[in-house]
């Protein structure tokens, strides 16, 4: 059973030889492969090289296109700079005044360099891994993308002061995401991640008003193309987790800040699994083997065995390689303790 087969079987509720391991590796991957982060973000072959190397070196079951949240924002007009070996920096947001929303148009992925690059990354994965790994593309979720083009503080006040304009922007963002999903899946994606990171900052009422239906629409489109859907929201999503599950996403990431998920398990549908939730800093980066083991076992029990092994968010670049290798080894230990699904 290879990594692709293992991941798909586990998601579907079938047998697997061990628990799938899906760590989020971005800055860690670039550092491990000796690649400048600017190149990791901007050169598809370099990002793919780093991710494939990490998948081999750390027994990861997936490869993905994550590096930063700015591809769509740049296409909408947010101006960025790319430091030599650091995350991209915002120089000017696309929506400075609320009236700028009136000029927004649905993106055509082929017209924008970084959107084309993501499709190229998927094509490289498809050609170079030959169905071995679970390939995951990415789009920004509606609210996260709005924050990327507006500024997170302004975006949050806009929800109250300019709801009509925000709805218009979110509709355009959602249609743009749909347009971006299609070529990614056609290029060879098995899964599309929806990164709506900021949704943990809003109330359940605001999540339902501005985010839920749009995320569900993205999930439905992904499914219509025959791919799996994953939702990643940073922070404590306890208050909105029931709604997130109702989007129909196949994989729901659980941040370490989220309260125990036991009460939500009854809402997990057939073919839905969680992913998480070890703390990337206190557990993976700074912890020892016993702390890592305890964290993995705790969440796996909490999730009733319906969880992909991962951290709650990105593995830090300061994580010792030995800690990540031990973390990966827990996939076998978890499978030995629990029958898969």
Residue spans for each PLM region:
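Active-site loop segments of alpha/beta catalytic cores
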Residues: 1-30, 35-40, 50, 54, ...
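Loop-to-helix transition at the N-terminal end of transmembrane alpha-helices
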Residues: 45-48
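Membrane-interface helix-loop-helix modules in multi-pass inner-membrane proteins
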Residues: 95-101
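Membrane helical hairpin/interfacial module
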Residues: 58-71
């Amino acid at each position: 059973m290879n990594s692709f087969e293992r991941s798909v079987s586990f998601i579907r509720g079938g047998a697997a030889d061990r628990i799938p391991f899906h760590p989020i590796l971005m800055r860690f991957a670039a550092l491990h492969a000796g690649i400048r982060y600017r190149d990791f973000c901007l050169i598809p072959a370099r990002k793919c090289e780093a991710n494939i190397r990490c998948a081999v070196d750390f027994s990861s079951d997936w490869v993905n296109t994550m590096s930063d949240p700015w591809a769509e924002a740049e296409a909408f007009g947010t101006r960025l700079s790319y430091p030599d070996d650091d995350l991209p920096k915002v120089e000017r947001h696309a929506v400075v005044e609320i009236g700028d929303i009136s000029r927004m148009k649905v993106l055509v992925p082929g017209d924008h360099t970084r959107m084309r690059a993501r499709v190229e990354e998927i094509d490289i994965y498809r050609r170079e891994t030959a169905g071995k790994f679970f390939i995951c593309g990415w789009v920004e979720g509606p609210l996260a993308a709005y924050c990327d083009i507006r500024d997170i503080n302004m975006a949050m006040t806009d929800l109250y002061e300019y709801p009509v304009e925000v709805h218009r922007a979110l509709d355009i963002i959602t249609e743009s995401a749909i347009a971006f999903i299609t070529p990614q899946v056609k290029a060879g994606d098995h899964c599309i991640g929806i990164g709506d990171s900021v949704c943990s900052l809003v109330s359940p009422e605001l999540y339902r008003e501005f985010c839920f239906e749009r995320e569900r629409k993205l999930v439905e489109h992904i499914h219509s193309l025959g791919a799996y859907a994953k939702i990643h929201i940073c922070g404590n999503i306890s208050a909105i987790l029931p709604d997130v599950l109702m989007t129909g996403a196949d994989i729901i990431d659980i941040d370490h800040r989220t309260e125990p998920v036991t009460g939500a398990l009854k809402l997990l549908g057939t073919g839905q699994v969680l992913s998480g939730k070890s703390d990337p800093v206190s557990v993976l980066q700074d912890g020892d083997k016993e702390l890592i083991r305890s964290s993995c076992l705790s969440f796996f029990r909490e999730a009733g065995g319906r969880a992909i092994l991962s951290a709650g968010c990105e593995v830090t670049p300061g994580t010792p390689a030995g800690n990540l290798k031990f973390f990966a080894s827990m996939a076998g230990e978890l499978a030995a303790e629990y029958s898969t699904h």
